[in-house]
Amino acid sequence: IQIAEGWENTARVMKEISIIRSMTNNVAEHTRAQYQLHTGYLPSGGVKYPTFGSIVASDFPIPKDDLPSFVSIGTPGNTIGSGFLGMSQAPFVVNDASKLPANVSKANRLDEQRFSGRLSLLEDLEGQYANKGAKARVEDHKAIYANAARLVRSPNLKTFDIASESNEMQEKYGKTAFGRGCLLARRLVERGVPFVEVE
């Protein structure tokens, strides 16, 4: 294999890389091709298929942990979703790897008692909604909020903080959106997240 000039670091680790040359697509429209790449199916009106990440998250959840099983980095508005697997298997989206994910830190004035009180109120409201015939949707919503609450309270939230990496390590990955995304992906995989995609 010949590696292009300027890719010397890649050449050094080629034994760790798999090159896929058999992947083709005859779909000319980008959105449909992206859907097929992520699900294995062309879009159809009747069925919304889950992305591969959602399937992996469903089959290999992180046991008793507070990190999501599927993280999608740098994909604002481009995620395919969890399809018929439900919202609990949807990707945890990180738009910008250089920042903590949106809405994961409690406000300074919000202590644990108030935080728990708000979650309790939410549970009461969801119970009322579920009794009106929306039980499946409420169960999905409850699972998402429970996961979010665990993450907000977790010491593992620092996994998302790539600023804690040395400047030298950040330079190795590159201080671009993609480079920062790959650095975050490495940190997540090291913590046991089974599926991470970087766009």
Labelled PLM ranges:
Residues 1-199:
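Ligand-binding pockets and gating/stacking loops
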